[in-house]
Each structure stands twice: as structure tokens, then as C-alpha cells.
Amino acid sequence: MFYPDLSHECQVDRGPYVRAIGWLSHEHSFSTGLVSLEFLHALRRHTCAPWQPIIAAGAHRCEFCPPRSDGRFVGGSSNVWIPAEGVVYVAPVLVLHYIEAHGYCPPESFIRAVLDCPEQGTTAYRERMRRFPAWWVEYLDVGLPLGERKPSP
């Protein structure tokens, strides 16, 4: 499913604070280039165990790779949410594959946000995500012990 980089809509959310990243399709060109190892390591940490306010039905598969020898495709069904100043970047976890395998170069603002973002699931991460007037804020504390949960507004 294609969404232009930095658009205000993606598969799992939309709004003035949303910025889509890495929703690529073979039918549309995308920016290519090199990214730093520091950024790749930071993005990998975020995509390994991303916070998930919604579970999407079905996988987002890479349209650029042929099926593997077992007939399966490269893909994933999770998304990564990166809060930044005034915006939340939302990307499929496949964004890491696009960078490493296909040379995709995300916008510089996303790169800076990933480098600045606290680890997924930490108190600092949840506090940054709470800044947004979004439906998913109520899911920030799911799975936390009752004493650590914030009351709903």
C-alpha cells in the first residue's frame, strides 16, 4: 500500500500530526542514497520491538523482491511509530529492509527523529507519544502494571 513520504495519512492513522514514511510501491519512485550506520542501528532497535496500538490485518510485503525459494515474500505486519516535535512518523517495519536492500533514503527529518527517539516502550517514549490528541494515546499503558498507568483524559 503506497503513501507518499511525509503525507498526513498511512494505513493505520491519519491527521495533521501524522507523517507517513516508507510506504513504498513498485508503481512509484522513491528517494535513494546512503544513510549512516548510527541511524540504521537506531532504526533496527525501534523495529525489533515496536509499540503497536493496532494490529493490521495481513502483512505489508516488499513489492521489489521476488518470492523466496519457499514461495514466501519478504514482509512484515508491524509498524514503527516515531514521535518528534509536533509530528508522529509512522512506517512499516519493512522500512529497514527497504533501506538495506533497495537503497531507500528516508527524509532527513525522519532520520533525525529516529536518532532522537527514546526506546520503544520506555516511560520517555510514552510521554512523547502522549503529546498527540490521537485515538491511540489510550493504548500507551496497555500491559503496564496498574500503578504505572496514567489516567485517561
Q: Language-model segments: what does each one mean?
A:
Residues M1-P153:
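Alpha-helical interaction/linker modules in multidomain eukaryotic proteins
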